[in-house]
């Protein structure tokens, strides 16, 4: 029986040696500009992806089956917001909220491209209206409110739409006494919106105060690569339970900014999830394929306790 090249690879999820060397050599020139940035896994862009940690060539079909985790080194590659929703929410139970909300360029901001152009390009690239998806759905049979940031939309930056959608999600969860899960992936506040983007930090923190303290409801924050800037400085670190993916980059300011400001060298891994966990800033580091089960157990434990608003 004649076997196609694709079928041959599908029978062998691990490939290396001469094949891996050949593939690396054949794609080296085209990958030069990609070496220093994370690879977004998208089947429409080809059959192969490259792990940003170990450099191994990965067959996209198997990579997606493995939740975008490198099977060679265990590195967690980036995921779209829709992929994360499909990972956590039971099939056919997802109900999006405020999905038609889109940003406006009220400051007429422009650098290389206008803000309006950047929004349109990101919308075309991702199919999203902005850098977060919010909604409700069942997680192993438990109804939760879920917000998922998408780094592929303008670096997951937080502007007025992101802040408003998350705020409305928290208010919705408060009214219906739902557990809240926010998946963070962001480069920080969106500079194109100026002060409007910065005020989202205070706005979200305020509604979380009502949700957590006054109503005693459960908020779980999940930090992924990368979670930085205004998201880290606000709702990212306000969870009752704070979870991170392995080796996630979590910071307020970048390493170079810190070193230039303090005029001293900071150690490697200083802003990795494992370092934050060792210093008591995180509660758990959970591999991606175990996250749904962990969230389900925490939510189930919380819901098993009789609700007492006082």
Swiss-Prot record:
One cellular-component annotation, GO? acetyl-CoA carboxylase complex
The entry lists its GO molecular-function terms as: acetyl-CoA carboxylase activity; ATP binding; carboxyl- or carbamoyltransferase activity; zinc ion binding
Q: Return the SUPFAM superfamilies for the record.
A: ClpP/crotonase
Q: Which InterPro entries match?
A: AcCoA_carboxyl_beta (IPR034733), Acetyl_CoA_COase_Trfase_b_su (IPR000438), ClpP/crotonase-like_dom_sf (IPR029045), COA_CT_N (IPR011762)
Q: Which Gene3D superfamilies match?
A: 2-enoyl-CoA Hydratase, Chain A, domain 1
The enzyme class is: transferase
Q: Which GO terms describe its biological process?
A: fatty acid biosynthetic process; malonyl-CoA biosynthetic process
Keywords recorded for this protein, A-Z: ATP-binding, Chloroplast, Fatty acid biosynthesis, Fatty acid metabolism, Lipid biosynthesis, Lipid metabolism, Metal-binding, Nucleotide-binding, Plastid, Transferase, Zinc, Zinc-finger
Family statement: Belongs to the AccD/PCCB family.
* Matching PANTHER family: ACETYL-COENZYME A CARBOXYLASE CARBOXYL TRANSFERASE SUBUNIT BETA, CHLOROPLASTIC
Protein name, as recorded: Acetyl-coenzyme A carboxylase carboxyl transferase subunit beta, chloroplastic
* Annotated organism of origin: Adiantum capillus-veneris (Maidenhair fern)
